[in-house]
C-alpha cells in the first residue's frame, strides 16, 4: 500500500449517515438475520468487521476478542481509532454517530475504505441498539476517550479520560436478554469464524479468549494467524485427506483494481469442495467469482489434456464436473461495490468479476501445468477416472429415478407413508432397524408422519465412489421416499427438490454409541449429497429420553444425567438405589405409546434442527471423522476422549 493511500484522512468528514436506528429494537431479525444463537454471534462479527476493515486499509495488525464471565464481549484492535471530532451534519461526536446511527461509518466513504466487510453493513450501531450496555473506548491522537450507552442511547457525551500511547478502538457489549432467545456465546462458533478471517487476511493476528472457567477451572484461548493466507487455509481443509498432488497452487494477484486470491489442490476423494468469499463474506451460494474460477479450471485443464493426447488415449468424454472431483479450493475476491443476490443474499452478482477471476486463474494454472508436468498428468488421470465413474453413476442414478415416487409404485416397500400429501405438513422419520421401525409405525400420527426403517448402518459416503453411493439399497430408499432426484436444468449434479414429499426429515436412532454413529453416517450423506435439505432447515434429529425414573406414583422421563440426578435428589433424598431408574439404550425398549409421548408428539417432543454454521469447518470435520486418513481422527479422539460418555 502506498504512503499516499496511508495518508487518506480519516476524520468526522469520512463518516456518512444513511438512516436512523429506531427500527432495530422493534424488528431485530431484519437487521441481523434472527434473534437466536446465529443472531447473537452475528453481533460479534459486526464489531470484528470494523477491525478487519482497518486491517484491509493497512492500519490494524492485532484484534483481541474476549468472552467475559457474564457473557459480555470485548473486541479491541490497534487501528487508528474511530474519529471523535465534531460531526458537522449530526452536531455530535463522530464516535457517537458511528455508535448510534444505522449505516453510519467510514465504509460508505470510498476514500476511507476501498473495500469493506459486512454483508448487510448494519454496523456497530446495530450491536449497540441490541445491547443493554455498550462501552466504546478510543485511543487516538495521544488521548483516550470513552462513551457508554444503554439500548443504543448514550448515557453521556464522549469524554476524554486520559492519555494514550497507542491507537485503536475497544467495544464491550452485553446482548439484551429480552430480545435474544439465546445469550450464551459458544466458543467454537466464534473460533471457526475468526479462524476463517485470519486465513482470509494474511498477517492479521486474532486472539480469542474465553474467561468463563469450566468445571476444572480452566479457560480457553486461541491465536489465529496466517502468514500465507489461503494457501494455509487449503492445507488446513485438506489435512484430513490423502493428497493427490503435493502442492497447493496459490494465486494472489490484482486484476483491474480487483484483488483476487485463489488457493487450490487435489486429493484422492470424490468430493468437490469450493469455498468462496467476497470481502471476507462467505458466499455460500457462489456467484460470478465461482463461475469464473470453474470456467478457467475447465478450459485450462481440458486444453492440457488435449494437447498432451491423454484424452485421445483414454477414449472417454469429459465434462466440467470431472475436473472438480477431488478438488479443494478457496476463492477470495475484494470488490469495491459488491452486488449480492440469491435466497440468502450470499451470491455475488457482479458480472465483471467472472472475467477477472477467469483471467487470473487461467494464466496462473497454465503456468503451473507447464512447470509441473508430473502433477499435471496426475490431475488429468484423476479427471479421466472421474469421467468413467460419472458414467457408471449415471446408470445407477437412472435406476434410482426410473419410477416416479409421486405415482406411489416406486416407493420403498418398508416405507410406512402418511396420508397427507402436503409436504409442509409431512414428516419422514428415518429409524434405525425394523424393531424400532415397527414401534414407531404403531405410535405415529398416520396423517402426517411417515416411517422409513433403515437396515443397520448406511454406507459411509465419505469413502465411496459416486456410483457406489447410488447402488446402496438404503440410500436408494432415502432418495425414493423423499421424492428428490439428481440433476436440474442448471446443474447435472444438483439436488432437484421440486417433488420433495416432506418438509421435516427426522433422524431417530437409539440413544447409544451405535445410534450416534448412525446419526453421523446419515448426516455425512446429507451434507455431501443433499446439502440443500440442511440449508433449507428440513433436517432434524430426534431426542428420545435416556431414562425413565420412578418413585412410588411419581414417574418422570429424563433426557440428561443432570435431570436424572435432580429427580434422585428430589424424590430419593440423593440415594439413587431408592429410585427405580430405567435406562433406554434402544428405541425398541419403549412401547409405542411411550415413543409417541416422549419423542414423536409435536406437542411436547424435542427436535434438534441441523444447521451449517460454517461450511468450511463442517467440510473439515466430516472429512476428519469419516474419511480414509486415520491420523487426524486418532488425534481428535485422543484430544477429546475425556469428554466421551461411555455406554455401560
Name each region found by the language model.
Residues 87-88, 95:
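Short adenine-binding "F-helix/F-box" segment of the Bergerat
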Residues 88, 341-354, 557-563, 567-568:
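Helical (often loop-to-helix) elements that flank the catalytic cores of nucleotide-handling enzymes
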Residues 388-407, 422-427, 438, 442-444, ...:
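C-terminal interaction appendages of subunits in large macromolecular complexes
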